[in-house]
Amino acid sequence: MVEAVSVVACLILATVLIYVSQSPFYQTSSTSVDVIIPPGAGVNASLGFEPSTVKVVIGVNNTVIWMNEDSDWHDVHSDTGVFYSGMIQPGSSWTYTFTSSGTYPYHCDPHPWMTGTVIVDSV
């Protein structure tokens, strides 16, 4: 009888743990936002940073990762000089964590049609 109770208790515990681990309430949100530099962005003026505008919240998801999926080198240069990535080689990425709220327009120096904006809110 004790073995049967132990088995039932283990099954109940396993069911609860599976439910909790898959519940959105208990999942942590991402602390970063991805911006893609797509293939062809260096030669095709209709392509650029994807998405071109991102919104982040300080202390929640205030890190932006720019990923260069193009075969050309790119940079991420704040229009106001707040941040600058240097050249990002193909297949690499650059990360910046925003600590002040505001609107941050940026561009790619070698490819002036590539522009974007990061909007940073505080909690």
Predicted region positions:
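Extracytoplasmic copper-binding redox domains, predominantly the cupredoxin/blue-copper superfamily
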Residues: 1-123
